[in-house]
């Protein structure tokens, strides 16, 4: 998903000193006095002002057919949850990428110092396999494919499974008259039958469990409205239905729920998973004869697959575990027969899923049928409690997602639109579905003060940089809060040349502040891509961009150990201070970091003061 230039994302900017016609090239004691007056503290004399680390990863055992290989950094930020408790919000950032690789490759990376982990990834046959980097090494050897797991699956005995009349209910939608005179019924087996039907599942390894958490919740972040990402997958509405193959059981395993059970009335624990199915040609024939597809789908029998209160603990929350599986049963077409045992699914059926929310808290405001196919949610999405999700007409309640070659269905069962309330693994006899989540590249921001006696708003020149792949780096000049004539050197691009004056590149005069004054006209960045060596690093001083102040005849480079912070390279989507605002007032933890970079507020740049940043 594309991010706006000045929205807080995980990228990096280069901050430079404030620009104005004040200041001069004075002696170092004058500079030191100015720094102390501006910041009000004494900085660590051994501070190197570095927020970044670098390394090389050896990736081996790359599967045949891999189209590219990437490196990702896992980063986190502290946020407050609904109970005002601190928890970590994670993100994955792409660091480097290589194509046309063989069975092994070495990739160089730069990453924020405070990263939690580095992952190597290989794209193979529409899936993204990932390995945690340990001691600079990632090995893909010995990967067990979904096909191998599928061959190992054992078909259950369907012959004793029958529908139970006392487990037939009129849907909430039908009770509310949403289908007019028509009635909609939900069918299921007895509670005892489900207890017999459940099978013990092979648990995930500790490493896969960690990968699941890191990937899923970096993409579907908690309490973040993720509908846009759902729609980008294109696996919504009529595309949300997997197609049965008839050659293996279809197995569904609940692996996660998060509903703050004790606070909100055990929402998931009180709910059930249902499914329904049809043949595409039957639906097509119905529509061809003048029928409506939504009416057809609503009229299909809905069968209970999993009573969540038999699987999850009543207060279980935010726990990833695959411990039990339920095989979907084919009950025939048309009106259900209570006396006919179930069968394995034949080929050629499309399967849809629905969660029947029936929490006892605030009922019936929080009760209703929630469909993966958004076309069936045009009433429930406007029902008293559910309407606060803002999913609107046709808003889906579920999305497919791959973690490696395993397939998961992620449900939004409540109102916060984060699509991580219930997560189910679906495997076996269905055609492959591929949706690999994409993550933003890591960015670095170079921020410079253009004069020695600066105001340290660190926006005199701001450069955003990102590594596109092994041999390509992109630089963008995104802001210039200075009146001096300035040049960006050491980029050596087609546009950002050593002798190119920054204001001229934006087509404005030198008495113009560029993207540093709130409410002023925003100008598009000036961007260049340059070719670099495979061992390139943003930490290499020989290849780092720096500023030449033509007016003062001075070069401004990134700050070194013991110097004042006149040039800093910052990771993530850093938002630079607005004009004439010292960085300590835009980021209240900056001074703590400046006094002891090894201990204090090493992630200060994640917490801006909104009114003081651009």
Predicted features and spans:
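Sec-dependent N-terminal signal peptides
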Residues: 4-13
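C-terminal motif of bacterial Sec signal peptides marking the signal peptidase cleavage site
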Residues: 15-17
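Extracellular distal adhesion/interaction modules in secreted or cell-surface proteins
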Residues: 21-614
